[in-house]
């Protein structure tokens, strides 16, 4: 039986050759297809352009671990495909590991075969932590029809935290312009992201 580890132990024991998450006390490697990486990079680059052009006080990265809690209180170490972080928070302790316990501004998860993690587990954990905006990018339309409808088509879900701390969601498909609270001037079209 493998001994369960804490988030702090995860930061120390996490291998440096690749990307890993702490899931239910175990270190789990994240392996992505090239298409998955292309979609995440396109979104990250689009956010970076907004930050630079509008002089916004954010940092965008794909290398940050975030401490979350499950409903049962189990520590997780999540690593969103794209993280948008308040620059002051990011720079508050620059010698620390690239890990945060505080809520970030925006998390993006690009779905893969373990899509239920993004639609169920991470959705709950990110809401519980208080992440203001969360995107689930189902560029292949692989989630259950319960989530993306029937017929199943590629969809981007944007979850926004409301005043009561609950996510409200909007789905974007095809030629829909993605509406973002964090980046109100963003002009991304859903199919642009899906067809990278």
Give short role names for the model-derived ranges.
Residues 1-196:
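Gly/Pro/Ser/Thr-rich low-complexity, intrinsically disordered segments predominantly at protein N-termini
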